[in-house]
Amino acid sequence: MTSFMSRVWCKVESTGRQLPIVLNAVLVFSITAEVSYLVLVEAPFEPEQKKTDWSTIWTGLHLFAQYFMLGNITWNASLFVKTNPSIRGVFLGGDTLGQGWRYCYNCETHTPPRCSHCYDCNVCVLRRDHHCVFFGQCVGFHNYRYFLTCLLFMWAGLLYAVVMNAEVFIFILKEGVTFHSVMLLLVPWIMLVSGQVTTRAFAFAFIADTCVVGFLLVAAFLFFHVALMLRGQTTREWYSTRRPYSLGTMANIRECLGKNWYFCWLCPLIPSPLPGDGINFKVTASLEPKKQAVH
């Protein structure tokens, strides 16, 4: 009985970890479908305007831009989840342990500096930043590039979606700021359940609201992590005033994005080897010239 309940609990726990990924995927593809509809069906042409070659090219550019961003989001997210950031399968070193090494009683092994245990993943993660609940995976040394690039394209995609949904907001507010329009923008679910709006109006209002809220949240996450990258810090190290691992702006960027940092963000398949191994880190003090003793 205990074994059966244990297996059931493991299944429930596994499903719970996958649920945020599924919900994120549904939201991303719903927004993409809605923006595609706005571009293809609700194109901003006046009734008397005819479709020209330029309008066709413009529509094609719109579709290319949004599916380029969608492809980068899904690909980076997939590689982020698949890339193992933990100490599993990693040779951590010999008997000599340097400064900053600690013993993890959960993993029953010594761990290098900047490595910490994640109780959600139940393993220690190299240069652990935080556990990302949206993807059910820890952000660490080996998958930080995919996490940051995914955030970048999510921010760009949501900004694009907000601009494209401007017509939806204009349509809702065309009769002025009324109780009906405000409620539709703030709580579209209540308006749908109470029968005040159609399913179509609810869908457009809900997705437009999601784009705005999502854009603000992703922008905050992106700018915070860009600041961390430039400072050579993790989220855990942000609270400390010291920055022993900050090697300068360009070196900090290379530490996170790799050798080809300046163009690897365009596509997750572009190779960009990281300069370190996630175990040994240069510190600021090691870059300073040694002072000679004065006799």
Swiss-Prot record:
It is found in: Membrane. Pfam families: DHHC (PF01529). It is a multi-pass membrane protein. The active site is at C132. It catalyses: L-cysteinyl-[protein] + hexadecanoyl-CoA = S-hexadecanoyl-L-cysteinyl-[protein] + CoA. It comes from the Eukaryota. GO terms for molecular function: protein-cysteine S-palmitoyltransferase activity. Residues 42-60, 173-176, 225-295 are extracellular. The keyword Repeat does not apply. The chain crosses the membrane at residues 21-41, 61-81, 152-172, 177-197, 204-224. GO terms for cellular component: endoplasmic reticulum; Golgi apparatus; membrane. Residues 102-152 form the DHHC domain. GO terms for biological process: protein targeting to membrane. Keywords: Acyltransferase, Lipoprotein, Membrane, Palmitate, Transferase, Transmembrane, Transmembrane helix. Its main location: membrane. It is an enzyme of class 2 (transferase). The keyword Lipoprotein applies. The DHHC domain is required for palmitoyltransferase activity. Probable palmitoyltransferase that could catalyze the addition of palmitate onto various protein substrates. Belongs to the DHHC palmitoyltransferase family. This is Probable palmitoyltransferase ZDHHC24.
